[in-house]
Amino acid sequence: MLLFFQKIKEETELNTTIRVEHLKKSYGNTCVVNDISLSVNKGEVFGLLGANGAGKSTTIECILGTRQADSGTVEILGMCPTKERKCLFENVGVQFQESNYQDKILVSELCEETQCLYKEVTDYKILLEQFGLSDKLKSPVSELSGGQKQKLFIVLALIPNPKVVFLDELTTGLDTKARRDVWKCLSELKKKGLTIFLTSHFMDEVENLCDRIMILKKGNTVFSGTIEEAIASSPYKEFEEVYLWYAEEEMMNENI
């Protein structure tokens, strides 16, 4: 019996792409990430949600190892982000919200420079076509619209052919059709086993893509589970109202 449960535990651990335990981060006397624990399985889409200032960005930075946590442990693909960065980031894609690129650098040049950083890559021309940017190949990045830049940043995150990708504010700046096109592309990648960790302020997007979610409020976990579980444990039936109830409870109480 003991061997049976040990086998189950090992299989579960092998299937876990991201594991975070008791993560904490403070700035002075202000705790911005308070004892957060989560796990994300292979091929799963996990959404980290919360109002501005809830601690989402700091949590992601601590998970990626770009910001030092005060305490807690993090593993991505079984590796410690702060100790095994080179090996880890061969297998992790990160979408950056804002980046300063050389003036007049072309889309194709930026993609080629990104490809040179990795051993095994996805053909960026295929990705540009999937995300509706193939006609911008020779365009300067500075001349792209906000929505086009957003899609390009997703493409750059996918170029290293990652096993897990972090997408921050996934489709901000995109129109309805472009957002749905991005959803479709990511759903196809998920079917191939890609693990996706995302943040978003669009609840229809979260409902469409996410297998599980975590909602933060002032650095604390106020909900963790599936969207169905979130709805069932609230007084609301629409997920957007459920999210507001969890993330911005004071505002909602004024209207109840």
Identify what each model region corresponds to.
Residues 140-144:
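Conserved ABC ATPase signature
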Residues 112, 116, 121-136:
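Conserved ABC ATPase "signature" region
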Residues 165-169:
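Catalytic Walker B motif of ABC-type/P-loop ATPase nucleotide-binding domains
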Residues 224-225:
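ABC ATPase "signature
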